Each structure stands twice: as C-alpha cells, then as structure tokens.
C-alpha cells in the first residue's frame, strides 16, 4: 500500500518543483498576477483525472461506490465551513499541505513546521480531544439510497451510462482548458498538469487492487495531504504499533520527488522564518488548515483533485470555498484590510 502512495507522491513532488504546480500559487497568479497559466494547469489535471478514473471504473478496475468520497453522505455545511477555513489558513500560512511538503523537500524549514503543526491539528480534530465536538457539529454517516456523485445524479435522470458522463466531462474540461493561449504556449505546463492527474488515477487503481486482492478489505483512496501527515508523524514515533499506509507513502513520495526536482534544477537550499511574527502567522494558518481539511474531509488535493475525479458532490463546493477562503486571506495579507499579527 505504501509503495502505491510513494509512486504517486513522487510524481506530485516532481510536478510541484519542475512544473510549478501549486494551489496557492495558481490562486495568487489569477488574483494578483498577470498570468493564469498555473490556474489552467488545474483544468488539465482535473480533466486527465476524470478521464482516467472513470475509465478505470468502466473497465472494471475501480468500484466508485467504494471510494472514500462516494461512501459517505455529503454534509454541505462541512464542505463550506471546512473549505473556507482551509483556504484562509492556506493563504496566511503561505502553503497548503502538499505545497509545504514539496518545499520541505527542498530544505524549507518553515514548511517543515507548517507540515508538523497541520498534521497534529488535523489529528486533534480527527481522533483527538476535539473529535467529538467536530462530529457533533458536522456529523458523518454512510451513504443512503443514492450515491452522492454528480455522474450518478445525471445517470439517474438521463438514460446515459455514468462512465460516459465522467469521461465526457473530463474530455470537455481538457478541451476548454487548451483554449488558454498561455497554456498552449507552455507544453511543460500541460505535461505536468497531466502528470498530476495521472498521480490521482494511480492512487485509485492501486488502492482498489489492494482492497480487492488483499487480506483485509480497505477503503479505496487517493492522494490527500492533511490526515496522512499526522499518520506519518505517528508512524515515525510508534512504528511498532502502526502499519505504514498509502498516505504515509504519499507524504514521503512528495518530499522525495520535490528533493529530486530541486536537485535537478539546482534550487536546493536551507530556509527559515525571518521573524517571530511570520512564524506565528504560519503556525496559525497551519492549525486552520488541519482543522478545515478534517471538517471538509479533504484538502485542496484531497477534495480539489481526488474527490473531483469521482465527481463527488462535495468536490466543487469545497474547492470553490477553498479558493474563496484563500482570496480572503491573500487580501488580508497583501491589502491589509485588517491586522492578523
């Protein structure tokens, strides 16, 4: 299981450093910059992930109903509040969990701190002292009669196979994204966006195969980077009492892939916080990301890519709220409409 996560994680780490694939960077470029190429990379990543995921399902290699995001009933309040909290925390921390791991692989000690704090706060909300409060405010339950997926919804009301819906959505998304002139002028951006999509698909394929052929039936998952960071910390501290998981392999893969990318580009260097105020701000953002991702059942990668690739109800709502929360946080940092430190 860990090797499956490691493979996709390495691809994601390379995409972050060689392809500059970054959630917050894409939002910053779109909102404040003069280019939207990195934002367009998300369209390629999502399109490839949709085509690959629904292609796996059509070929009998993936049971969509067994995936994490389609096996839980959707709680819209959790998506909205968790997404906004995560997005805001991402902006004031300066990175999401995935981005922090990628930067940590290049020697950024600030990102090491962000990753640790986010992982711990996520586990506090997931299974620690605040888990009962979280469940009381945002209860989770198993799926009822209907699978909470957009492709399933369309297939219930229109006589069309749900796989055709998902694959068509992916093809259209890629086609529309390729209308972007800046993206077409950067073949490398198209390539690395596609690599991210392939990484997501590889996660579904591997965990489905392991679930179907392993000794114990397990949940089918793909990449996400909040709870797995906490899992990795627990494994490092108590390996005798914990098994290494897909998430642990994924976290290690991103760090190793980013390290390889930095060595290739010659960007490896040690960095640290410049002053205590910066450290305090980034720690606060990391705490918010940890709590927000657990409430929303996924981070910018977990909901924005993995959940989106199965067209879960939660994905577009959570991703939109993450973007909105990030824009609010960026405005606060850049335009200073209120103090945060």
Where are these regions (language model features)?
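Membrane-interfacial helix-loop segments of redox and metal-homeostasis proteins
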Residues: 1-341
